[in-house]
Amino acid sequence: MIKNYLTSLKQEFSGYNTAKLMKDIMAGLTVCAVALPLALAFGVSSGATAAAGLVTAIIAGVVIAVLGGASFQISGPTGAMSAVLVGIVASYGLQGVFFACFAAGALLLLAGIFKLGRLISFIPMPVIMGFTSGIAIIIAMGQIDNFFGTASEGSSNLAKIASYTRLGFHPNLQAVLIGLLVVVVMIVWPKKWGARVPGSLVGIILATVVSALFRMDSIATVGDIPRTLMLADRLDLGSLNLDMLKNLISPIVTIAALGMIESLLCGASASRMKNEPFNADQELIAQGVGNILLPLFGGVPATAAIARTSVAVKSGQQTRLASVFHSVFLLASMFLLGSVMARLPLAALAGVLMVTAWRMNDWGGIRYIFSHKLKSGISQFLITMLATVIFDLTVAILLGVAYSAILYIAKSSQIGVSFSDIDANKLRTVEGKPPVLETTGVVYVTGSLFFGAVDEFNRRMAEMPAYDHVIFSLRGMPNIDVSGAQAVLELCESLQKQGKTVACCGMADGVRTYFDRTGITVLLGENAYFWNAEDAILDLLSAEIAE
């Protein structure tokens, strides 16, 4: 693994020169402009602080990039992760988040070491779309107070919204105007300009200037930005204990699962953009190490972010140094512009997050499944989205995957069975119509024969005509499991007890292996297997003549 990493690193920097260095520096600067407002916003929306989001972006941008599985990944705090963290902060405080981040990092590290990166391929796309949309809803719900300048109570977003019925909903007009200003700027900002100066950055600068000029003192601001990478609120290793671990098992798994999903999806997408290889397992190792280190500095969990990564690629990024430079520029901003960032209105950051939440949705994919009326895809999407909003990400993914598995089993259990008499006229090597063919039939089986299809298989076999000689054509049966093999064995035993002969033809290698292991081959004999039905019929005729 280390050898492969060093080899890929050597290839990445082969022919590196001043021109490529300048491209990495400029790409890093551009990504910094995108990452700065997002880091501040996601830090606040996670229930931590803007400084925590900034530290996360700086540390992750260096550590995860250097150890990562590709040259193009840019990691940091994300909207999806912040939506998960806000509930953990409400229940367990910042120390709970730091501990969960540390433990989730260890899980990601182990996942990379044991090469579990391919697990992401088992999550259906509608499920991923569903939890992404669910997270977008959670982000938007979590910013209602900051955007409208209201106050709510509750440990979850749903509880906070419900509290408005008791506390009342009294928007602060100044906060709403600042939030709307940012939203409008982000929407109307030209894409060609956004490639260099993102609309989110322009929006929060304008919002800060407007709030200062018009003395909008009633609006809450970001507050103090410490000029240090070692925040006062950080993981206290002395506080780690088994009881905390037991309480945080679900959040730990949630953070690790989200880190894996976001990072690997981002890597796969950017890999296609750059036409470069992506080592999923190495990326998980990098994400693990990064998330183990982050809470020691006071950072929150990080993942690879598609928004920042795509900006880097489009800005001419050459190597992973672009991510390092983005962190350097963020660090410079922290030390040089900390006093300015402290005055940023929370309503402005809420505006950024509202637009970000809207853009998070895979609108192309959503339109596709609804416009084509793909009922299974729509149900997978809706179930996962609602579960994400009502429960949490871990439950949502488990529900989505379990529901998808049930749909697959239901569809796969529709096994096809048909019966066909022998038409001697279609047999090229047979003249006339031998009497034995009148009591011979071919049974065609199509579809995988596994536990979900056994009942239908048995029901159809009970309708088999009274053949004396049965030939099973299994060319359309690609797979079989133990339950299916047991059903075939019992059927063959029953037919033989009735004095009937049984032959099989057109078996896939995997099906033949199961027949060998489950005793079907011993029961029927090796001479009962043929390449096609005609060969089986000719063998039957030969045996008839010999008698």
Task: Name every feature range the model reports, one short phrase each.
Residues S75, C504-C505, F530:
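Active-site-adjacent beta-strand anchor residues
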Residues M1-I2, I537-E547:
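Intrinsically disordered or compositionally simple regulatory linkers and C-terminal tails
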Residues M1-D423, A487, G519:
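Transmembrane helical cores of multi-pass ion-transport proteins
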Residues L231, R359-L523, L541-E544:
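The feature marks cytosolic C-terminal regulatory regions of anion transporters and related permeases
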Residues L524-D539:
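Short acidic-hydrophobic, aromatic-tinged amphipathic segments that line or gate anion-handling sites
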Residues I135, L474, W531:
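Residues that line or immediately flank small-molecule/substrate-binding pockets and catalytic motifs
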Residues V328, V511-R512, W531:
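Short secondary-structure capping/turn micro-motifs that flank functional sites
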